[in-house]
Regions:
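P-loop NTPase Walker
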Residues: 1-98, 236, 318-321, 819
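Accessory C-terminal helicase-associated subdomains
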Residues: 199-202, 433-497, 504-505, 517-522, ...
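Conserved non-catalytic scaffold segment of RNase H-like nuclease domains
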Residues: 79, 494-593, 597-605, 620, ...
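Helicase P-loop NTPase motor core
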Residues: 19, 24-32, 300-303, 308-399, ...
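Conserved P-loop NTPase-based nucleic-acid remodeling module centered on helicase motor cores
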Residues: 48-148, 607, 629
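Conserved helicase NTPase motor core
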Residues: 2-12, 16-21, 76, 105-110, ...
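Conserved helicase core region in the C-terminal RecA-like lobe
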Residues: 78-86, 245-249, 273, 748-798, ...
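Conserved RecA-like helicase ATPase core segment
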Residues: 38, 255-347, 528-532, 544, ...
């Protein structure tokens, strides 16, 4: 398939920026892939190309097309959230901090919000009915709005300040107040308990929410956006990194997301792609008009519009064109196609919703082709759920062999949000991040009945005494009654070794040390120093060189020794001591032990501790926990940061303050809390450490099987769907088995779970069921035949949209529904509504009148 003249113009434009407006089916992804191929031909490297899009499906399509057309697999292709995640990871890596954080999905956010809110309500009332009632998605929307407003007011995403001011302004907005209401069984229900909590104690609630996530190394989607924005706007990212930037689905891009990407435009050729008529995410902050106007005015973008449709035939194209003209007054060019294989649109008037379901069922039963090529679509999940229930009732009246299998995307498609899968993931997360309080809370609530629900969050209140929920997964608390026992004992016996490595790069598994520095000290003072330069086999990366400044020539002239000699001497220096570093558990400890193993040496340490983790336990409200931040907090001067010996000296001083002023004075309180609660956690500690050992051996199947049997996740009478989910999870995770370090690979994979999701079209093919999906879920999908159900007044447009007087986005939703079919579109609507014994007339959607008569049967 060749490029059209418009596609060719966009693909070969490198002397100007381009705004590519591409209506549904006009080959936008095809154009993007060819522009990337052309960039590579012109000498731009894969690392200098950045492609961003809105959905995982679009991301995978772009990757596949780029690979197909130019054979290149290393071009940077991300979703917007995935790019923000990468910015945060790269920033912390450049600071010498390897973050183990995970990304929380809306289920995690909803569960955490509900738990925290119910706990706070209990503090002021003994009424057991005083609980929150909103669904998980609604909680996520409210949290997101508060964080968005806080950012608009100019507050840092790290700061606990600003929540009160944000909430005060939002409470004046009726749209925000409406988020506290939901519909159940057709009736509007307002969660006054949660509304009043946010109104009266909202800042306190948001700080608890923030602390719960940050202390567990969890970020929600809003954290990704606002932390990435903070990094970019502070100048802590390389804004000249890319020579070609392509931002896809611009109509779905939020203003803040655009502000982040915009910072990289100055030294790049930029192409923004999208279709302004498919803007259906205004509720989450998309602002295509503002973005397009800014891009045209400030980046001299030339507008190129694709017109040749490659998806559907002339009837469906004329229907879409006529609809846009009638709904928006948009004059679109005639479709460039001679394809007449499609059919005119069928509009089917039904009786009530039961009759509509029966008619749709019969249409599918009589469909001659593969039923995975047909789709049932509606405006809302609520409408689809009602249809699904009616289809289920019809199926029950038929022999098994005659039944039609259906699935709803809301329940079946979101694999990683299935309860049984999230239970597995909670256990797996605890093996790589014992401090994940959200996972601990889920395990306790659903699978560990011997521990009282809420205990994990209650234990975090003892952070000032050094109590962390991760302590109960540490065998030392069962042996000694205190996670800090070995550290305190070593301090009293003058055998604490603070150490630090400067390295060839930021990968603890692949890079090598170029400097090992340490001091041995205790309560009696400092007793010995250790400082060696090491001649590495690997080349020193540019990033590492810019951090510490030591090249191989410098190392050679400053007594650089072999890694074997350095490890031998350090093992003797630290023999029998407790080793402490800053962020060492995520970097230095890993590199040290890996290189010791490589040299056939043993590091005989009495324990490992990390001042970053200690600080996070005692101090929850810090902007970050970098060594420089803690030095500033405690008045420690580190004049030669990123020299290993200078960093060691600073770490020693900070650790001494932590021990003398926090860890030792709080020992009695900490030990009493641990001793009172540890027995309830002991079986879980043993199990998690066993699962961890299985993962370290690369036995992912064994770990999943062990988790399933130990906590009854899969039982003989478990549903077939749960068994299949467990197997599918293993298939998704088995790539970890053959990696050099399975725990680290698993940690990286789990961090991306919330960002990955599934591809709708692949799920449909796998399940071999007829999909029921919303218009929003259909974005990026296409089907031979589409049945658009519920096209009645107050369904589309929705009642809230009609009441607001602004139906613009509802009209666009209808347009998206019109453009998903390749060959046939059937629109159905119920003409009656039955309440009890009463029957009422129901009007069709007024948008049906916008479809040209000559496109309708």
């Amino acid at each position: 398939m060749s490029l059209s003249p418009e596609q060719e113009k966009a693909a070969f434009a490198f002397d100007k920026n381009v705004l590519l407006l591409a209506p549904a089916g006009t080959g936008k992804t095809f154009t993007v892939a060819h522009k990337v191929a052309e960039a590579l031909k012109r000498g731009i490297t894969p690392a200098e190309i950045l492609c961003l899009t809105f959905t995982v499906k679009a991301q995978e399509e772009i990757k596949a097309d780029v690979t197909a057309y130019c054979g290149e697999t290393t071009v940077n292709v991300y979703t917007l959230h995935g790019f923000c995640y990468r910015l945060i990871k790269d920033y912390y890596s450049s600071e010498g901090v390897k973050t183990p954080f995970s990304v929380a999905d809306e289920v995690d956010v909803g569960e955490t919000t509900k738990r925290l809110a119910d706990d706070m309500l209990k503090e002021k009332s003994d009424d057991p009915d005083e609980k929150t009632v909103l669904p998980e998605k609604q909680f996520s929307r409210i949290i997101s709005e508060i964080k968005r407003r806080k950012d608009e007011l100019g507050f840092s995403p790290y700061s606990p300040d600003g929540f009160g001011a944000a909430i005060a302004t939002l409470l004046k907005n009726p749209d925000f107040c409406e988020l506290f209401s939901t519909r159940k069984f057709g009736a509007k229900i307002t969660d006054y308990n949660f509304f009043n909590l946010i109104k009266n104690r909202g800042a306190e609630f948001m700080i608890r929410y923030r602390d719960a996530f940050f202390s567990s190394d969890l970020l929600d989607f809003d954290d990704l956006i606002y932390m990435a924005k903070d990094i970019v706007f502070r100048g802590d990212a390389d804004l000249n990194a890319y020579k070609l930037i392509i931002l896809d689905e611009v109509q779905d891009t939020g203003k803040t997301e655009y502000e982040i990407v915009r910072k990289f435009f100055t030294h790049a050729t930029v192409m923004l792609c999208g279709d302004e008529n498919q803007t259906i995410y205004g509720w989450r902050g998309s602002a295509p008009e503002e973005i397009i106007n800014d891009f045209k005015q400030n980046f001299n973008a030339e507008e190129i519009r694709l017109t040749a449709n490659r998806r559907s035939g002339k009837f469906l194209q004329n229907a879409a064109r006529g609809y846009l003209s009638a709904a928006f007054g948009t004059a679109a060019p005639p479709p460039e196609t001679t394809d007449e294989t499609d059919e005119k649109i069928t509009i089917l008037k039904c009786g009530d919703e039961t009759d509509e379901a029966r008619k749709i069922y019969d249409l599918i039963k009589n469909y001659p082709g593969d039923r995975t090529n047909i789709c049932i679509m509606a405006r809302s999940n609520r409408y689809l759920a009602a249809l699904y229930n009616k289809f289920t009732q019809i199926n029950r009246t038929l022999p098994v062999t005659e039944r039609i299998p259906f699935f709803t995307a809301n329940a079946d498609y979101q694999f990683y949000k299935k309860p049984v899968v999230k239970d597995f993931l909670a256990f797996l997360r605890l093996t790589v991040n014992p401090g994940d309080a959200a996972s601990m809370e889920r395990v306790i609530k659903r699978r560990l009945k011997r521990v009282k629900t809420g205990l994990a969050s209650a234990l975090s209140d003892y952070g000032t005494a050094g109590v962390s929920v991760s302590d109960f997964l540490n065998p030392d608390v069962y042996r000694y009654g205190d996670a800090f026992y070995k550290l305190i004992k070593a301090y009293n016996e003058d055998r604490v070794v603070c150490y630090d490595l400067e390295t060839t790069g930021a990968d603890p598994y692949d890079d090598e040390p170029i400097q090992i520095s340490a001091v041995k000290f205790g309560k009696g003072g400092e007793s010995a120093e250790f400082n060696l330069f090491v001649m590495p086999d690997k080349e020193i990366s540019a990033g590492a060189l810019s951090t510490h400044g030591y090249d191989k020539k410098y190392i050679a002239t400053h007594g650089g020794v072999s890694i074997n000699e350095a490890i031998t001497r350090f093992s003797l220096f630290s023999d029998g001591c407790v080793l402490v570093g800053h962020n060492s558990s995520q970097f230095d400890d890993i590199m040290l032990m890996k290189n010791a193993k490589k040299c056939g040496k043993e590091i005989n340490a009495d324990g490992f501790f990390d001042t970053l983790k200690i600080a996070k336990t005692f101090f929850k409200a810090e902007k970050n926990y970098k060594l420089s931040t803690l030095c500033e907090k405690f008045g420690v001067i580190n004049e030669l940061a990123h020299d290993a010996f200078a960093d060691v000296t600073a770490t020693e001083k900070i650790l001494k303050i932590l021990l003398d002023e926090y860890i030792i004075p709080s020992a009695a309180v900490r030990q009493s809390v641990i001793i009172a609660n540890r027995e309830a956690f002991k079986p879980l500690c043993d199990d998690v450490n066993r699962f961890k050992a299985e993962i370290e051996r690369g036995d992912i199947r064994g770990a999943i099987t062990d988790i399933a049997s130990s906590y009854s996740l899969i039982k003989p009478d478990s549903p077939v769907e749960d068994r299949e989910s467990a197997n599918d999870l293993y298939v998704a995770l088995r790539c970890v088995e053959n990696t050099e370090n399975p725990p680290d690979a698993l940690s990286e994979l789990l961090a991306n779970v919330a960002l990955s999701g599934s591809q709708m079209d692949l799920v449909i093919k796998k399940l071999k069921k007829v999909p029921l999906i919303t218009v929003h879920q259909s974005k990026g999908c296409e089907f031979d035949e589409v049945i658009f159900a519920g096209a009645s007044e107050n369904e589309i447009p929705s009642y809230p949209a009609r009441a607001s007087g602004d139906e613009t986005e509802e009209k666009r939703v209808f347009y998206v529904a019109l453009t998903r079919a390749k060959r046939k579109l059937i629109i159905t609507y119920p003409s009656k509504k039955i309440y009890g014994q009463n029957e009422y007339e129901r009007a069709p959607s007024p948008y049906l009148d916008y479809i040209p008569d000559n496109c309708i049967e």
